Amino acid sequence: MKPSKPFVMPPVRIIPPTLEGQSESSKSLEEWLNTEETVRDLHFGKRTEEHMEYSYKSITNCTFSHIQFSACKLKSCHFTDVRFEHCDLSNISFAESSLFRVEFISCKLVGTNLPETILNHLTMKDCNARYLNL
């Protein structure tokens, strides 16, 4: 009797975000979230977002480049097709949120809180994620 080959799971294919038709935002993310339930199709660049605390908001088809998030809490928020590039998300809280097709590229994620957060098709490339809380 020949020994059987061990079962090997095929690699999981992670789907990248679909980022299309984005406009450069003239307002901060906080200004958008103060007036909108859903923020979509925007590119945010080089700014600081401080002391934001929002719940039950949606962010769709957005890119964040060189953004520093300081003392921010985004509870039960939904992120779909979002890319963070060269951002500092240290100690930000995404508690009870869902992240679907989200990329973190060259980001600082030290102490980022993701308790009870749903992570689907999420990638982290060249990130510092020490003390990340899942």
Indicate where each model-derived feature is located.
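Tandem repeat scaffolds
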Residues: 4-8, 13-134
